[in-house]
Amino acid sequence: MNKPVLVSFLVSGDPNPDATLKFMKALDKYSGVIELGIPFSDPVADGPTIQAADVRALSNGFKIAKSFEVLKEFRKESDTPVILMTYYNPVFKRGIETFVMQAKEAGANGLIIVDLPLQEATEYREICKKHEMGTVFLAAPNTPEERLKISDEASTEFLYLISTFGITGARESFEQMTFDFIKRARTTCKGKICVGFGISKGSHAESLIEQGADGVIVGSAFVDIIKNYGDSEEALVKLEELAKELSEGIEKGYEKRNK
């Protein structure tokens, strides 16, 4: 991840596992990383768009093993890094080491456990290190300097900067607070920083990359397309179109940053 990248998020199994595989392939062309969300019944960090996607997947009988199967199929055609996003409960129930080993075997490059605080993640980090599984932790605009440093050190893939307070979901524009946070993280952190929450168009990506981000994470905007078009050719076209627009925005932001 040398040049800034698009990190594209999908909910695994929404509306069905076969569709997820097709959607991953459609986004692959313009994505530097794919983030695959494992549906959970109580996704507290997610807004209504992704919560509804979780419900759609779970109501179709989704099981965690299906996420691993989809990823294995994707790995037959692509080596684009894939980060699995989940909550702690499903990992704990399966057993941390079992989950990490199964994710690794399926072809995952890293994990995000959204509701696992860094101070409680010692065992998890040790297991990930043992199995060469990447880790991603989150930081918010009010994260103190020292915690930002520790979160950066604990994140082997990238640090996930939450652009604003609250839950995920598309918004019109970003406040100065977000840009200030990127600049602060840029000076504090040694690793890669990617910004998520609320990004839905090329102009968003452009402004965030221009401020110094190494990547933008886009979820709700893609999931909205899937909600509206379902498992269809039109969904594939719309997903690829949006990924292209975002990718072009990233490129423009990178050019501006390097002028």
Curated annotation (Swiss-Prot):
<keyword id="KW-0456">Lyase</keyword>
<dbReference type="InterPro" id="IPR018204">
    <property type="entry name" value="Trp_synthase_alpha_AS"/>
</dbReference>
<feature type="active site" description="Proton acceptor">
    <location>
        <position position="46"/>
    </location>
</feature>
<dbReference type="GO" id="GO:0005829">
    <property type="term" value="C:cytosol"/>
</dbReference>
<comment type="pathway">
    <text>Amino-acid biosynthesis; L-tryptophan biosynthesis; L-tryptophan from chorismate: step 5/5.</text>
</comment>
<dbReference type="InterPro" id="IPR011060">
    <property type="entry name" value="RibuloseP-bd_barrel"/>
</dbReference>
<protein>
    <recommendedName>
        <fullName>Tryptophan synthase alpha chain</fullName>
        <ecNumber>4.2.1.20</ecNumber>
    </recommendedName>
</protein>
<keyword id="KW-0057">Aromatic amino acid biosynthesis</keyword>
<dbReference type="GO" id="GO:0004834">
    <property type="term" value="F:tryptophan synthase activity"/>
</dbReference>
<comment type="function">
    <text>The alpha subunit is responsible for the aldol cleavage of indoleglycerol phosphate to indole and glyceraldehyde 3-phosphate.</text>
</comment>
<dbReference type="InterPro" id="IPR002028">
    <property type="entry name" value="Trp_synthase_suA"/>
</dbReference>
<comment type="subunit">
    <text>Tetramer of two alpha and two beta chains.</text>
</comment>
<keyword id="KW-0822">Tryptophan biosynthesis</keyword>
<dbReference type="InterPro" id="IPR013785">
    <property type="entry name" value="Aldolase_TIM"/>
</dbReference>
<dbReference type="Pfam" id="PF00290">
    <property type="entry name" value="Trp_syntA"/>
</dbReference>
<comment type="similarity">
    <text>Belongs to the TrpA family.</text>
</comment>
<feature type="active site" description="Proton acceptor">
    <location>
        <position position="35"/>
    </location>
</feature>
<keyword id="KW-0028">Amino-acid biosynthesis</keyword>
